[in-house]
Structures are given as structure tokens and as C-alpha cells.
Amino acid sequence: VLSSADKTNIKAAWDKVGGNAGEYGAEALERMFLSFPTTKTYFPHFDLSHGSAQVKGHGKKVGDALTNAVGHLDDLPGALSALSDLHAYKLRVDPVNFKLLSHCLLVTLANHLPSDFTPAVHASLDKFLASVSTVLTSKYR
């Protein structure tokens, strides 16, 4: 459960992300593909090379989804319902991959926002991404 302090930290951090959400999403995906090569199996039709248009496009989708989630911290299940359906029923993504991408997102954010990435902000963002992952995998059961 996100506390009011967590919500404040998440919104403040995401304000710093600003218009870079798609870029950071793509960077996190690329980091995930390099660090956890098995995740590439879900993207057999993608050009996974550095800076590819397909990775950038999917990164924008990730960034947009997270921006939407930040705007709906009090109703993540409602905000992410369609995305949860897509990943559970159509794409059938292994739930562990959400944890891997979350880790890569945290590394990416820490890299780009070092002075803002305090231990408290790190903890809040980690809880947020864990909550998003929980919602995205909730329909697997």
C-alpha cells in the first residue's frame, strides 16, 4: 500500500521525468534485454538493436502507461485494467518479467536523476513499480 509520503515522492519524481518517460522506458527495456536475455523471447519480431524504432516505440508505451499510473495512484487496478488484460490473456508474459523491467526502470531513473534519487524516493518508486506489477499480473490467477 502506498502511503501519502510515497505518493508525494512518486509524483515529484515523475514530474522530474517529465517528457522523458518514453526515452527512459526505452532505455529500461534495452537494459532489460541486455541484462536478462531471456526477456527477448517476447519480442521476436522486434529489432532489438540499440536505438531501434521498435524499442523506442515500446518504451513510449511503457512510459505512457507509467505516467497514466502515476496519475491514478489511488486506483491502479482501474487505470491499468486494459493493460492487465492484454498482458495476461493475449501476450501471456511471464510475471517475473515485470520485476525485471521494474529493476531496470529503477536503475535508469537513478542514472538520470541521481540527486533526486534519495533512499526515500527509491523506496517509494520501488513500491510503486511493485504495485503496478501486482496489478498487471492480477488477472493471471
UniProtKB/Swiss-Prot annotation:
Residues recorded with modification Phosphothreonine: 8, 108, 134, 137
Gene Ontology molecular-function annotations: haptoglobin binding; heme binding; iron ion binding; organic acid binding; oxygen binding; oxygen carrier activity; peroxidase activity
SUPFAM superfamilies assigned to the protein according to its UniProt record, in alphabetical order: Globin-like
InterPro entries referenced in this protein's UniProt entry, alphabetically: Globin, Globin-like_sf, Globin/Proto, Hemoglobin_a-typ, Hemoglobin_oxygen_transport, Hemoglobin_pi
Binding-site list for heme b: 87
Family, similarity comment: Belongs to the globin family.
Listed name of the protein: Hemoglobin subunit alpha
Organism for this UniProt entry: Rousettus aegyptiacus (Egyptian fruit bat)
Name of the gene this protein is made from: HBA
